[in-house]
Amino acid sequence: MKLADVEDHMQKSVEATQRAFNTIRTGRANTSLLDRVTVEYYGAETPLRSLANISTPDSSTIAIQPFDRNSLNLIEKAISMSDLGLTPNNDGTVIRLNIPPLTSDRRKELVKTASKLAEEGKVSIRNVRRDAVDSVKKQGKAGELSEDEVKDLQDKIQKLTDKYIAKVDGLLAEKEKDISTV
């Protein structure tokens, strides 16, 4: 396994963690809150973004304008069934979601959720490290690499691991600050 591949896999873990953080509600309207919402549309689970134009007319409202008016009730149902805790307001052409300000208890809950997502990201990075180190050790046993090369590569892999775990920690600190800001 090449170091560039290891770094690429670790970067993808950080990006996945960032995407997961984007789905956490922070009290401000953000269209990425709806990224995980899928709608049962003509028998298939379809991402909401494929069925509607999503916008934020102001800092506390998300507007969803379906391309097909027949999907309005389906979209409303999907949002109600999601884990977002938001109540859709359907006026016949547009669905509006009012984002209420967060309570202190809800903020604490969201910080815990963010911490859990960050830990999952770190575990993913550590799994990449484990696989890379195992690969290097196998190459060492097979005689493809000297002991010094094995040790050097292991050190480089550990440095990459530390770098990307620090990135996840930075994202977590940023998200916690975002959640805690009233």
Swiss-Prot record:
Keyword terms, alphabetized: Cytoplasm, Protein biosynthesis
This protein's record includes keyword Cytoplasm: yes
Main location per the UniProt record: cytoplasm
Gene3D superfamilies per record: 3.30.1360.40, Ribosome-recycling factor
GO molecular function, one term: ribosomal large subunit binding
GO terms for biological process, alphabetical: translational termination
Compartment(s) of residence: Cytoplasm
InterPro entries the record matches: Ribosome_recyc_fac, Ribosome_recyc_fac_dom, RRF_sf
UniProt superkingdom: Bacteria
GO CC annotations, alphabetized: cytoplasm
Function: Responsible for the release of ribosomes from messenger RNA at the termination of protein biosynthesis. May increase the efficiency of translation by recycling ribosomes from one round of translation to another.
Family statement drawn from the similarity comment of this UniProt entry: Belongs to the RRF family.
Alphabetical list of NCBIfam families matching this protein: frr
Protein name: Ribosome-recycling factor
Classification lineage: Bacteria, Bacillati, Cyanobacteriota, Cyanophyceae, Gomontiellales
